UniProtKB/Swiss-Prot annotation:
Record text on subunit structure and interactions: Homodimer.
GO BP, sorted A to Z: D-amino acid catabolic process
PANTHER family, A to Z: D-AMINOACYL-TRNA DEACYLASE 1 (PTHR10472:SF5), D-TYROSYL-TRNA TYR DEACYLASE (PTHR10472)
Gene name tied to this protein: dtd
Family per similarity comment: Belongs to the DTD family.
Annotated compartments: Cytoplasm
Name of the protein: D-aminoacyl-tRNA deacylase
Length: 150
């Protein structure tokens, strides 16, 4: 599971000229990618990490506020560009596997008291945001399993 987090002062998602999700910050835009090996345990662990990261103004977390999160599914986070000029999406989990896991991620954040808005799963979306900082952090479940260096 990969999540690109951006601290925002506001963000919104539009599908077919309809705003389907928006937040006023400070908050986080979370672009969420899932792969074949992700499980409900992976989702729960990363939801806890996202909720507790102290990257908002004043070194606070979403759980402290609570501050809102706009969660947007993004399979392209698992694009493989090692060969040729067209990315391969084979490392991204298919929709029937990733949609329930994405919904579980959203539910896990809400269970922690965090207000969450979402895009529309599988739709072509326009995401608008105003970065605050800018602060952008990549959270990768594979990296969390590795030992820390130095």
């Amino acid at each position: 599971m990969r999540i690109v987090l951006q601290v925002v002062s506001r963000a919104s998602v539009t599908v077919a000229e309809e705003t389907v999700g928006e937040i006023e910050g400070p908050g986080l835009l979370a672009l969420v990618g899932l792969t074949h090996t992700d499980t409900p345990e992976t989702v729960s662990r990363l939801a806890g990490k996202v909720a507790g990261l102290r990257i908002l103004p004043g070194e606070t977390s979403c759980a402290d506020g609570p501050s809102p999160v706009l969660a947007v599914s993004q399979f392209t986070l698992y694009g493989d560009v090692r060969k040729g000029r067209r990315p391969s999406w084979s490392r991204a989990a298919p929709g029937q596997q990733s949609e329930p896991l994405f919904e579980a991620f959203v539910a896990a954040l809400r269970e922690r008291g965090i207000p969450v808005r979402t895009g529309r799963f599988g739709a072509h979306m326009e995401v608008s945001l105003v970065n605050d900082g800018p602060v952008t952090v990549l959270v990768d479940s594979d990296e969390l399993d590795r030992p820390r260096r130095g």
